[in-house]
Amino acid sequence: MERITDVLCDLAKSYIEAGLDSVYFASLGGETCFFTDEEFEKWIKPFDLRIMKAIKDAGGYCFLHICKDGLNMERYRCYAPYADVVNWGVFEVPYDMEEGRELFGGKTLMGGLPNRHGVLVDGTHEQVEEEVKRVIADFGRKGLILGADCTLATEQDLEKVKQAVKTARSC
């Protein structure tokens, strides 16, 4: 774990030195079916925090993505000082945006839209527009980067993504 973490810290530093502004850091291991709280504390958290600190120390912004479902989100509370933006599967965990705002001490959150079902997958352009307006009205613009829970499918209709962007910019 030490070697892997050292390499990822060096890689993060190299990204920032090469001119990137930020690193999207995906944290795995918060799933309760794989690790106990004690195992997470020993085998996941210290290495995650070292990598996130390396991103910050290099002068970059750290986008923390907490990956997968079945998470114990409380395990990530102490990650807040190292994250500039936090993202997770709001519709998969479930852990809503307001709960995340509290958990991460008001950090900017990225999300609001599901990536595997819902308006981005099978909605009309009008439904995309309505959902984006609802998310922004419910959460507010401050501290929100509108986005999906996780990676969009390769077959994603990009016209729906464009509609979401257009709507968000007009709100």
Which residue stretches match the model-derived regions?
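Active-site loop segments of alpha/beta catalytic cores
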Residues: 1-171
